[in-house]
Amino acid sequence: MLVNTDINLIKTLSTLFSIGCLCSTLAHAQKIDCSSPNTSSMKKICAENLAESREKLTNHYVTAFLVSDAPVHLLEDTHTLWFKRLQQCKSLACYKQQFELRIEDLNFYTSLNQSLTNHYLKFENGQIASQPVHLQVHQLSKDRIKIEGIAYRNPNNKLETQSIPFLAYTTPEQKSEITDNEHDCKYQFDFNKAILSVKTEQKGCERFVGVYRIYD
């Protein structure tokens, strides 16, 4: 007959085994498949000189999945978008830089409380936009909101021109009229449950215009 100590030990071992299986499954699911690289970009991504970067990325992804309170679909979709950008690289420096940038993103999801942040990705015709845009709406306090954004460009550009930043501060009462402090662009934000519509009448500010879906 099992005593309580034995039962607790079995429960602990079962839990550890389950966690181990989950980690293994996640690592396998998100590990870059280098079993048969059939394109020029995949051959470069799967080369030995990026082995350490691939392993490091896999470990950070599993950690983010297990620890972060960010929505799972957000982790998955941003990872897919990142991989598409990675495949556009034309130099070893670009590949290494993109691995490091993705690891920074995963660390952000892991280290910060995401429960007070709403994440939005831009959609076109029911699909994530071909030129991806990611907006984050942070509830800093009951009367203070911070909106950050990033519009992705060519990863082969210089680091400072690989993306377009967005930054604004507002209040719950003034959430519809937003000014991007980065470029002095004025936008109309229409929050409607799972959908965010962004409009502007200013020329040169169109990059962030569009329809976004929330990740929750």
PLM regions: where:
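Edge beta-strand at a domain terminus
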Residues: L159-E173, T200-D216
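N-terminal glycine/threonine-rich, aromatic-flanked beta-hairpin/loop signature
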Residues: A129-F166
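N-terminal signal peptide c-region/cleavage motif recognized by signal peptidases
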Residues: L22-L26
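Contiguous, well-ordered beta-strand patches that form the walls/edges
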Residues: K84-L86, A151-K193
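Tryptophan-anchored aromatic micro-motifs
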Residues: S111-H134, Y212-Y215
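Bacterial N-terminal signal peptides that target proteins for export
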Residues: L2-L16
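Boundary at the C-terminal end of the N-terminal hydrophobic targeting segment
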Residues: A27-K31
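Amphipathic, heptad-repeat alpha-helical segments
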Residues: D33-S36, S41-L75
